[in-house]
């Protein structure tokens, strides 16, 4: 285990002002190699160069980005937008549907987003699975939800919706409310069809059968299995205890979170973000409200930044404690999970006193937080957390992490390299366990994290043991950050003085009718955000979580793209676990620390 404070100094915090990033190094490299006339550079509030190019150029450009001296080694996100109803598209290429690709270069600490316009009559693109293996699930999701075909894809099938589903839900002409559908009817013929679809056929999953003398055993692990940690199914192809092949099956927890973003106001969507990763609490609010604040041009007061950081770190500790208890339980020890739940209850006491709720406070607001900190909050933080948890962590390390059985079950198990992690889009503790110091709070500071003194724990072996030890040390660093928040909490307002702060400060509404009207409109109809695009990533509990928002100058988002870490982490499972035992798979699943709501959205 190593602790490091080193992080690149070349990163400038993205401001809300629009920019086309024409001066970005990667833009110059693309212009020089391919010619500037082949690209359109879009001005956005994402903080990332956004470059439009023709479909025919896509594979060449992606290959070029991978071979640069400081290459773009991670396909961070891939999704699409139905542009057919969008009004504000001045200066952009004609497009009915737009597919966007978000790449990250670790060496540069820089991103680039490529956009490819498509006509409704020809929704085809070449697959990127030959360049990035994690493009597989992202392309399946785009086909499933928007109906765009990726030629050459090895297994282009539904991933979120059931096999028998009709239509593509993220299209603008697809209903967003249950009342817009015909009444649901299940006759005998349809029931028979659904039962037929549930039959397991190995060939449909890309699994080989045996020969006339022997065959493999096929085992369903889930979708209701305690070690699956949620509604998650793994189909295993076994040769005895050895896993020859493995196919994850997701979508059982899909709730249409991105579609909901198109019919909720910017303000009323905040509670939905709480439930994307239901252990993260206000941590889930943070990337969303930061992205909206970029759209609005809101700079929050220093007190708001520090309050948000403190609350986010409280939920990080909560999540890591649940991971620790259940992980040790998966390996075979029962006692620690009861201790970690006792610790979590103490933290919930703090959270409830501050926000009024426990797991899903929905407490952050556009331009601030719901209300100021209550009297006596420092005593709660000190007594329930800072004076209690450090000693408990030492007990966990002695009782569990140094236990010979746990070490024997986890050291060297389900290990992968930094290069493999980047290829699959792995972030968070799963990436840092391989030895790479990449923490967004340090590399790309947001909400004032650059003002805090903390270290980034990294591992060295990238195995199940390192993933646990990294998270334990992250709890210690979070405790340090919370203590700094408590001792250095700035004075000042808990909301920004800005017309789009939602809801506006209540006391102002009692002084003049104009402010009262503004308050009424923003709470009922919602604030109107400028037509623009914004993006914000944060270091969430499970890895990097981000929101990419498109505003068309309305009270609601035109497109809400939620990139979650757990989706990428589950896609990596087959590449890591093939050739291992089933017992090792249980350890691996526990070490990932995923939540199915985070996967399925």
Curated annotation (Swiss-Prot):
UniProt KW Acetylation keyword: no
A GO term, aspect molecular function: NADH dehydrogenase (ubiquinone) activity
Localization per Swiss-Prot or TrEMBL: Cell inner membrane
Keywords: Cell inner membrane, Cell membrane, Membrane, Multifunctional enzyme, NAD, Quinone, Translocase, Transport, Ubiquinone
EC numbers: 7.1.1.-
Catalytic activity: a quinone + NADH + 5 H(+)(in) = a quinol + NAD(+) + 4 H(+)(out)
Pfam families assigned to the protein according to its UniProt record, in alphabetical order: Complex1_30kDa, Complex1_49kDa
Membrane topology: Peripheral membrane protein
Cellular component GO terms held in the UniProt record: NADH dehydrogenase complex; plasma membrane
UniProt-annotated stretches for the region NADH dehydrogenase I subunit C: 1-191
Residue numbers spanned by region NADH dehydrogenase I subunit D: 215-601
Main location: membrane
Keyword NAD (UniProt): yes
Self-association state and partner proteins as the record states: NDH-1 is composed of 13 different subunits. Subunits NuoB, CD, E, F, and G constitute the peripheral sector of the complex.
Similarity comment: In the N-terminal section; belongs to the complex I 30 kDa subunit family. In the C-terminal section; belongs to the complex I 49 kDa subunit family.
NCBIfam families assigned: NuoC_fam (TIGR01961), NuoD (TIGR01962), PRK06075.1 (NF004739), PRK11742.1 (NF008728)
Chain's role: NDH-1 shuttles electrons from NADH, via FMN and iron-sulfur (Fe-S) centers, to quinones in the respiratory chain. The immediate electron acceptor for the enzyme in this species is believed to be ubiquinone. Couples the redox reaction to proton translocation (for every two electrons transferred, four hydrogen ions are translocated across the cytoplasmic membrane), and thus conserves the redox energy in a proton gradient.
Protein name (record): NADH-quinone oxidoreductase subunit C/D
């Amino acid at each position: 285990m190593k602790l490091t404070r080193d992080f690149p100094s070349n990163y400038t915090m993205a401001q809300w002002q629009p920019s086309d990033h024409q001066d970005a190094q990667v833009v110059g490299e693309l212009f020089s190699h391919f010619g500037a006339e082949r690209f359109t550079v879009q001005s956005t509030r994402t903080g990332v160069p956004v470059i439009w190019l023709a479909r025919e150029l896509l594979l060449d450009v992606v290959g070029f980005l991978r071979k640069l001296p400081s290459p773009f080694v991670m396909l961070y996100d891939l999704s699409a937008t139905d542009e057919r109803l969008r009004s504000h598209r001045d200066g952009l290429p004609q497009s009915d549907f737009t597919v966007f690709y978000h790449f990250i270069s670790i060496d540069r600490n820089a991103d680039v987003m490529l956009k490819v316009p498509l006509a409704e009559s020809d929704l085809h693109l070449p697959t990127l699975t030959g360049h990035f293996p994690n493009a597989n699930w992202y392309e399946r999701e785009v086909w499933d939800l928007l109906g765009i075909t990726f030629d050459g894809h090895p297994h282009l099938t539904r991933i979120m919706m059931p096999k028998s589903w009709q239509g593509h839900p993220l299209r603008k002409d697809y209903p967003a409310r249950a009342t817009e559908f015909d009444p649901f009817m299940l006759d005998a013929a349809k029931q028979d069809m659904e039962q037929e679809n549930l039959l397991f056929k190995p060939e449909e999953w890309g699994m080989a059968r045996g020969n006339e003398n022997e065959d493999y055993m096929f085992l369903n692990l889930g979708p209701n299995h305690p070690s699956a940690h949620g509604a998650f199914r793994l189909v295993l192809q076994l040769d005895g205890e050895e896993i020859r092949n493995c196919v994850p099956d997701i979508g059982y927890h899909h709730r249409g979170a991105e579609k909901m973003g198109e019919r909720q106001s910017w303000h009323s969507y905040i509670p939905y973000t709480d439930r994307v990763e239901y252990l993260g609490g206000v941590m889930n609010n943070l990337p969303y409200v930061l992205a909206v604040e970029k759209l609005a041009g809101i700079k929050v007061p220093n007190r708001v930044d520090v309050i948000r950081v403190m609350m986010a770190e409280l939920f990080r500790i909560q999540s890591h404690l649940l991971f620790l208890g259940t992980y040790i339980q998966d390996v075979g020890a029962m006692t620690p999970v009861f201790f970690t739940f006792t610790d979590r209850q103490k933290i919930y006491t703090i959270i409830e006193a501050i926000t009024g709720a426990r797991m899903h406070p929905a407490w952050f607001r556009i331009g601030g937080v719901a209300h100021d900190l209550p009297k006596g909050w420092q005593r709660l933080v000190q007594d329930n957390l800072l004076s209690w948890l450090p000693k408990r962590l030492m007990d966990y390390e002695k009782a569990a992490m140094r236990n010979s059985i746990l070490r024997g079950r986890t050291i060297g198990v389900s290990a992968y390299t930094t290069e493999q992690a980047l290829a699959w889009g792995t972030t968070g503790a799963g990436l840092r366990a391989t030895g790479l110091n990449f923490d967004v709070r340090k590399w790309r500071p947001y909400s004032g994290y650059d003002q805090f003194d903390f270290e980034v724990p990294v591992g060295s072996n990238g195995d199940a043991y390192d993933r646990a030890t990294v998270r334990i040390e992250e709890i210690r660093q979070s405790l340090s950050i919370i203590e700094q928040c408590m001792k250095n909490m700035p004075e000042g307002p808990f909301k920004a003085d800005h017309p789009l702060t939602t809801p506006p400060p209540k006391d102002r509404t009692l002084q003049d009718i104009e402010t009262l009207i503004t308050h009424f409109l923003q709470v009922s109809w919602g604030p109107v955000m400028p037509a623009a695009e914004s993006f914000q990533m944060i270091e969430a509990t499970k890895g990097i979580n981000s929101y990419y928002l498109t505003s068309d100058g309305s009270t609601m988002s035109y497109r809400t793209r939620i990139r979650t870490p757990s989706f990428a982490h589950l896609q990596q499972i087959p590449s890591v676990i093939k050739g291992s035992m089933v017992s090792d798979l249980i350890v691996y699943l526990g070490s990932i620390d995923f939540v199915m709501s985070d996967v399925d959205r």
